[in-house]
Amino acid sequence: MKIAIIGAGNMGGALARGLAQGSLVQTSDIYVSNPSTAKLEALKGEYPNINTTTSNCDAVATADVVVLAVKPWKVEQVLDEIKPHLDYSRQAVASMVGGLDIEQLSAWLEKGGALPATYLIMPNTAIAVMQSMTFIVSARSTAEQDCALVDIFNELGKAMLIEQSAMPAATSLASCGIAYAFRYIRAAMEGGVELGVRADDAKHIVMQTLRGAVEVLAASDAHPEAEIDRVTTPGGLTIRGLNAMEAAGFTHSVIEGLRASTKR
């Protein structure tokens, strides 16, 4: 599969690097375009076989999937530029741009009544280390196309095909959620420092504890509360800490944060 990425910024660059490190797309089948050359040169320095260009039209010419990774206000302009060069019978178009829906993307893509297989793709910033939780919404695509795209993004973490109506909640849990996880880490570090632990040590302790918690939950496939019950003992330190956190509104704050981040 040949993939063209329009835009070599944070998300576009991370996608290109992730694909180059994966096994499903040959590095020579990755095409990246960007208006300035500095980011392209950096990519080329890391992966010499990646194809780079300042021409969006050249980038999409032979691609099976064209991925838009540009600023929201540039999407319509970019589509107007590349649309005459796209063959909708064989090329799919995917957007990694936040705030767009299938209907708007389709309106910009339409030419002569024709539309391509179209995707919305929403990774989170962990795509840079190939640990993204990525959501994919599809329209006018085949099951084969869907499976191929999900497989590719599974190499960059975990990918899930969802309905467009589920995207706000999914984005809140994963794209916003990664910031909430960082905020918990920061809060735990501050607590550790108050208790006399050096900041760097506290950071490593909290990070490893979270890694362990995730691995335990993945291995057991149990409800989180079941694993909490395994840790707590009657009258013990853990249940005291949990009760203090709940009294301060821990669960309520998390839920309210998730709800707030679904509102535009």
Which functions belong to the PLM regions below?
Residues M1-T54, D58-A61, Q131, V193-L195:
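NAD(P)+-binding Rossmann beta1-loop-alpha1 motif at the extreme N-terminus of oxidoreductases
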Residues L15, T37, Y47, N56-I136:
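Rossmann-like NAD(P)(H) cofactor-binding subdomain of soluble oxidoreductases
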Residues Q104-A117, M133-A169, Y180-A219, R264:
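Internal alpha-helical scaffold of NAD(P)-dependent oxidoreductase catalytic cores
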Residues Y119, M167-S172, P224-D229:
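Short pre-catalytic strand/loop immediately N-terminal to key active-site residues, enriched for Gly-Thr
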Residues Q26-D29, S89-Q91, A117, D200-D201:
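Short acidic capping loops at alpha-helix termini that bridge into adjacent secondary structure
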